[in-house]
Amino acid sequence: MQINLNDVKIEPSWKEVLKDEFLSENFARIKENFLKAKSAGVVYPPSGLIFNAFNLTPFHDVKVVILGQDPYHGANQAMGLSFSVPSGVRVPPSLVNIYKEIYADLGIKEPNSGDLTKWAKQGVLLLNSTLSVSAGAANSHASFGWQGFTDAVIRKISENLQNVVFMLWGNPAKAKAPLIDASKHLILEAAHPSPLARGAFFGCRHFSKANIYLAKHGKTPIEWDLNTKI
């Protein structure tokens, strides 16, 4: 059953760009699966934050894409932005390692908060491949159809924008590289920042590389320092 576009609550530029996706059979299936999961138990992030990454970073503002897998599945963690948690919530291990790399790369002191909203507002699309999860069950919504939707997001950015930096960390993210036109965008690949990768993420210097690339192409670099206000 086709979705009514008026029912999709997402930033207008994304609604236009992704119109065909929202009207597809795949998205109808996502909605059906999501509603079933929601009726069966707690789902993260809260419904109003599912499209938070898109609402904070309009389509034509996208400069950097940081691809995650699925939302955090613990209480009060997921906020619709890959790797991000609300202020006051303990910073997860992968994000701790991201902060360590930013310090090593740019000398920026590690912040106390795990809230990455400031990055999103500057054009960093913090995109998970799967946009929902059941409480306590990692990857539980991996078969819902979200991957087809977020693959389309990556393709739309690649096709319609210029000089975007894609940060692909870990094998699932690296598998998305064929969706991106490397002749007009920068693809940066590294191990996942998770402690399970045994430190292989460190030394990638993706944050300085992104800013050098953006500046070279006439774009304002990202202020990665979360200790200062925008």
Curated annotation (Swiss-Prot):
Keyword DNA damage assigned = yes
Keyword terms = Cytoplasm, DNA damage, DNA repair, Hydrolase
Q: Which cellular component, as a GO term, is one annotated location?
A: cytoplasm
Enumerate the catalysed reactions: Hydrolyzes single-stranded DNA or mismatched double-stranded DNA and polynucleotides, releasing free uracil
Q: Which PROSITE patterns match?
A: U_DNA_GLYCOSYLASE
EC category: hydrolase
Q: What is its main location?
A: cytoplasm
Enzyme Commission code: 3.2.2.27
Catalytic residues, per the record, are 70
| Function statement | Excises uracil residues from the DNA which can arise as a result of misincorporation of dUMP residues by DNA polymerase or due to deamination of cytosine.
- Read off the NCBIfam families from this record: PRK05254.1-1, PRK05254.1-2, PRK05254.1-4, PRK05254.1-5, ung
Q: Which family does it belong to?
A: Belongs to the uracil-DNA glycosylase (UDG) superfamily. UNG family.
Q: What is this protein called?
A: Uracil-DNA glycosylase
